Structure formats: structure tokens, C-alpha cells
């Protein structure tokens, strides 16, 4: 009997030692987290943190440099970039709800309220220093906060400017206008540069039917999309917005200086394909647009947005870095975010022409000296109007873009378009989180 007890105890000890040797633990199961942050902490090996983005790091050199520089400065952390190539915002909500939790993730500013109000993001107020906050450009701060709480850190800023195809201008014998040009001059030039038909057709201006492209022109007229409380849209009541809508309608239907989406896409799916094919003379873009044109060998220059009533206004979009609320090691995640959104990371993005800095701590001297027009990007940081965000912005934008198709095609009048948008917005924008 004693021998049986001894053998049982010996067997139990062997099983326990085997479990420990294999790294087993009764508490080791039950997490669906996508993070690897716990690895390496006990062994002295670097901890691996996962960073989810819609960019493929193998195709973006500035991301590769950010990763290399961060890991060199933080040898205890390794970064693994994970690409979500399509339908990013909705896909990430599904992943977070299912327990797949990255350590850091990229997020567009218009999605920050949606995520924050659904309790998916970690507040950053206790992690970001006052120095960090004080150095942000004014256009950036609104993009990072929801109801007074900071939920995001800026990846970069994209103030909009007007790109001009200098080859098309030269071929037509038209001089590049001065940087204080007006919307009236812009319209006249667009008409002059719209010629031909069929295979020989070319157009003065084009913008893809995306919300940020359309809003750039609304912002130029100092217009608005949402009411102050965000519960309705103001297209039929805000006079500046109505003026902008009428102007865009006229570009398509009165002056006929814009190709349809179908006409533009015959040159490629990229929204700037017609510009790069020397078929569109002017188009709104951001700093990263220059990299696209440079890679294609496109001849171009840049001007500020044409002025309306003596003032040049541009819109600006902010892409951000956020930390999911359930991230395993928030302090480590913040070290990544602080680098990517801080002086070091944003200097890399600026130097490699992928985005304007969100922080005044970044030195723009060399960037401005590169070209005569780079100063326009930097000047826009002080005056740009933030892209409007809303809890129900995604659904609103889908509806808005669908209605825009009918407006540009001349199926709807501006008044009918404004009324239809406002009526549908009354239902969409009053939905709770």
C-alpha cells in the first residue's frame, strides 16, 4: 500500500515538472489576443508588439525606416507590422470584438469617434506629456480627442493643395498663376484647358467621388457639413455650403470641365491616373501625391487652394495611431506610438514625402528648401480646416457619395441634392453608439 502511494506521488511530480518544462500553465488559455507582447519578458529576449495598418510595410520605405530606427532605439521591443488591405475600419472592429487585439493600430481621424464611443480605444491623457500636447498644430488637436478625452496620436497631417500639370499648361501656352489666385481664375483656366473629344479629350479639373476630395472644395468656400451638435447636416441651410455645392455642380454640368468617373478611370484605377496621363490639368492632392507623381515622372507644380472672397482655405485630414483598450501592455504600446507620432517618426515621414508633421517640434527647414512650393504645405498647417468627423460619419459618407453621383451627373439639381442629403442625415446622424 505504501509502495502504491509512493508511485502515485512520484508520477504526479514527474507530470508537474513536465508541464513546467513545456511552459504550460492552467491560466495560459482563454485569451484570443493577437498581441505577442508577453513573449520575451521573462527570457530577456525582445518583446514583439504587433502594429496593424492598411499599409503594406514592404511597399513603404518610410515605415521600414520607422521600424528600424525605433528598434535601434528600443532594443527590448521588436515590431511586427500586420496589413489589413481592405475595408480596414469595419474589419478592425470585427477583430477587436472577436478578441484579436493588436498592440498599436492605425486609424483615420473620421473613425476615432466611432471607436472611442464604442469603448474600443485606450484614453491617452495619462500617457501623453503636456509638452507633446502643446507642440501639436491646432488643426491636429480636434482630430485626436472625443468629448475632451485624447484617444489618438497623429500619424501625419494631410493639408490639401492644388496640383497643376505643368506639361498641359505649357502645351496650351497658359502661364502658371500666382499663389494668390482666385476661384474665378481657376474656373477660367479650367475652361481653357478643357478641349477635344474622344481619345483626344482632356479636362481642366477632376476630383474622385470621395468625401475628403469633395469636402476640400466645400472648405474652400468656408462651408460646413454637420450642425454644431452633430445630429443633422446643414447642406440646405448653410449659405457657404450651398455656394460650394452650386460651384461643383457647375464645374460638371455648366462649364463641363470635369471628366466623369468612368472617363477618368479609363486611364487607370488610381484617382490621379488621368492627371498622370496628361488628361487632367488640375487636381486637389496632399503631400503624398507628390511621391506618386515623382514615381510616374509626371510634370507638376503646386499652388495653395484658390481664394474665395480674398481668403485661401484648405481642408486637412489627420491619420492617427491608437492603442486598443484591451492592449496587453499599454506602456509598451505608448512607447511605439510616442515614437511614430513624435519628433523622430514624423521627421522620417516628412523627409520621405509621406506626410506633414503634426508637431511643431519637427524641423521643416530642409523640406521647405527642396522646392519652391513646399512652403505651401507648411503654411497650410497653421490655417487648415479639419475634416469633419461624426459618430455616424461612415454611414453618412456612404449616403453622401451616392447622392453626389446623381449631382455630378446632372440628375439632381443642387437644391434637390441638398434636401435629399439633409433628410437622410436626420435619420443617420441621430443614431446612438
Description of each model-found segment:
Residues 69-136, 145, 171-173, 273-276, ...:
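Extracytoplasmic "Venus flytrap"/periplasmic binding protein-like
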Residues 123-136, 178-179, 196-198, 203-204, ...:
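Short, solvent-exposed loop/beta-turn-alpha elements that line the ligand-binding surface or hinge
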Amino acid at each position: 500500500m505504501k509502495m502504491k502511494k509512493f508511485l502515485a506521488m512520484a508520477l504526479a511530480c514527474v507530470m508537474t515538472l513536465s508541464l513546467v518544462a513545456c511552459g504550460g500553465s492552467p491560466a495560459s488559455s482563454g485569451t484570443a489576443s493577437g498581441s505577442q507582447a508577453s513573449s520575451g519578458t521573462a527570457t530577456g529576449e525582445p518583446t514583439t508588439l504587433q502594429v496593424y495598418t492598411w499599409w503594406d510595410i514592404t511597399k513603404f520605405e518610410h515605415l521600414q525606416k520607422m521600424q528600424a530606427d525605433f528598434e535601434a532605439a528600443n532594443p527590448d521591443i521588436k515590431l511586427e507590422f500586420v496589413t489589413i488591405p481592405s475595408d480596414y475600419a469595419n474589419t478592425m472592429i470585427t477583430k477587436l470584438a472577436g478578441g484579436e487585439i493588436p498592440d498599436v493600430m492605425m486609424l483615420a481621424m473620421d473613425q476615432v469617434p466611432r471607436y472611442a464611443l464604442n469603448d474600443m480605444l485606450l484614453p491617452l491623457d495619462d500617457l501623453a506629456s503636456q509638452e507633446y500636447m502643446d507642440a501639436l498644430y491646432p488643426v491636429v488637436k480636434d482630430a485626436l480627442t472625443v468629448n475632451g478625452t485624447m484617444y489618438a496620436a497623429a500619424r501625419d497631417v494631410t493639408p490639401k493643395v492644388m496640383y497643376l500639370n505643368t506639361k498641359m499648361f505649357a502645351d496650351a501656352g497658359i502661364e502658371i498663376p500666382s499663389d494668390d489666385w482666385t476661384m474665378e481664375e481657376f474656373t477660367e483656366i479650367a475652361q481653357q484647358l478643357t478641349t477635344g473629344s474622344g481619345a483626344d479629350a482632356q479636362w481642366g479639373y477632376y476630383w474622385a467621388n470621395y468625401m475628403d476630395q469633395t469636402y476640400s472644395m466645400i472648405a474652400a468656400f468656408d462651408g460646413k457639413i454637420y450642425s454644431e451638435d452633430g445630429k443633422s447636416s446643414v447642406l440646405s441651410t448653410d449659405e457657404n455650403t450651398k455656394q460650394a455645392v452650386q460651384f461643383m455642380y457647375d464645374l460638371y454640368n455648366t462649364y463641363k470641365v470635369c471628366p466623369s468617373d468612368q472617363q477618368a478611370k479609363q486611364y487607370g484605377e488610381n484617382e490621379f491616373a488621368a492627371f498622370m496621363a496628361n488628361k487632367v490639368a488640375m487636381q486637389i492632392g496632399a503631400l503624398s501625391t507628390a511621391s506618386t507623381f515623382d514615381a510616374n515622372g509626371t510634370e507638376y507644380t503646386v499652388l495653395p487652394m484658390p481664394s474665395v472672397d480674398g481668403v485661401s482655405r484648405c481642408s486637412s485630414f489627420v491619420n492617427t495611431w491608437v492603442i486598443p483598450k484591451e492592449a496587453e501592455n499599454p506602456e509598451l504600446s505608448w512607447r511605439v506610438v510616442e515614437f511614430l507620432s513624435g519628433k523622430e517618426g514624423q521627421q522620417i515621414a516628412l523627409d520621405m514625402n509621406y506626410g506633414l508633421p503634426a508637431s511643431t517640434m519637427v524641423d521643416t527647414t530642409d523640406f521647405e528648401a527642396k522646392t519652391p512650393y513646399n512652403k505651401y504645405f507648411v503654411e497650410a498647417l497653421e490655417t487648415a480646416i479639419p475634416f469633419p468627423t461624426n459618430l455616424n460619419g461612415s454611414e453618412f459618407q456612404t449616403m453622401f457619395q451616392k447622392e453626389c453621383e446623381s449631382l455630378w451627373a446632372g440628375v439632381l439639381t443642387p437644391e434637390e441634392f441638398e434636401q435629399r442629403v439633409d433628410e437622410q442625415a436626420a435619420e443617420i446622424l441621430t443614431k446612438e453608439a
